[in-house]
Structures are given as C-alpha cells and as structure tokens.
C-alpha cells in the first residue's frame, strides 16, 4: 500500500534536523514529503543537503496550516497520506494503524 507522509514546514530547519530522522527511519514503506511554506531560513538547503530521500514541495507563499497542506496535497500521487507537524517524533510501527 502506498502512503505519503507530509510534513508542513516554515522556517523550521532546526526542527527538521531534530525530528525528520525518526520520520525517515520509521516510515520505510512511505514516501516522505516536506511541504515548505516559503521559508526564509535555510530549510530547503538543509533538506537538499542532509535529507536527499525526502521529496520537497515548495509552496509559493506562507499559506498557514490548512491551506499549506491543501496546496501540498495537489502534488501527492499516493492514495493515502499522513499529515504531521514538523515537531513530531515518531516511533517504530507508527504507520501500522493507518495502513
């Protein structure tokens, strides 16, 4: 079953370093996306340099929470998805109840 994990980000380079590793590690059967809400920090550079397996969706503006996710979902092909905040640390098998 294909599932997308989508993290909304705005100026969260520090949070990406802190929490994205667990999401990547424990989402082995998912495609991980970061939807960036027009960050002005180095979030995009951090993603490209340190997390090359993560797919980046660059929103044109800071759309806020709901619209930011809605904009990102236009680029997702997977039939199922999990929307999570950038300050969430996941644990092993966290996706099992969803799939």
Indicate where each model-derived feature is located.
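Cell-envelope/extracellular polymer assembly enzymes that use nucleotide-activated donors
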Residues: 2-4, 31
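A conserved acidic beta->alpha catalytic loop
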Residues: 22, 36-45, 61
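Short, acidic, metal-binding catalytic loop of nucleotide-sugar glycosyltransferases
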Residues: 22-30
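A short, amphipathic alpha-helix embedded in the catalytic core of nucleotide-handling enzymes
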Residues: 23, 47, 72, 94-99
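Short beta-strand/loop segment that forms part of the nucleotide-sugar
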Residues: 29-38, 57-59
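Acidic donor-binding/catalytic loop of UDP-sugar-dependent glycosyltransferases
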Residues: 42, 88-99
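Glycine-rich, basic loop-to-helix element that forms the pyrophosphate-binding segment
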Residues: 59-76
């Amino acid at each position: 079953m294909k599932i997308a994990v989508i993290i909304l980000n705005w100026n969260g380079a520090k949070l990406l370093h802190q929490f994205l590793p667990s999401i990547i590690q424990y989402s082995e059967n998912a495609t991980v996306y970061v939807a960036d809400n027009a960050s002005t920090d180095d979030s995009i550079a951090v993603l490209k340099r340190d997390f090359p397996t993560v797919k980046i969706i660059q929103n044109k503006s800071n759309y806020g929470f709901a619209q930011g996710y809605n904009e990102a979902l236009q680029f997702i092909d997977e039939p199922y998805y999990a929307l999570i905040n950038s300050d969430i640390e996941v644990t092993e098998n966290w996706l099992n109840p969803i799939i």
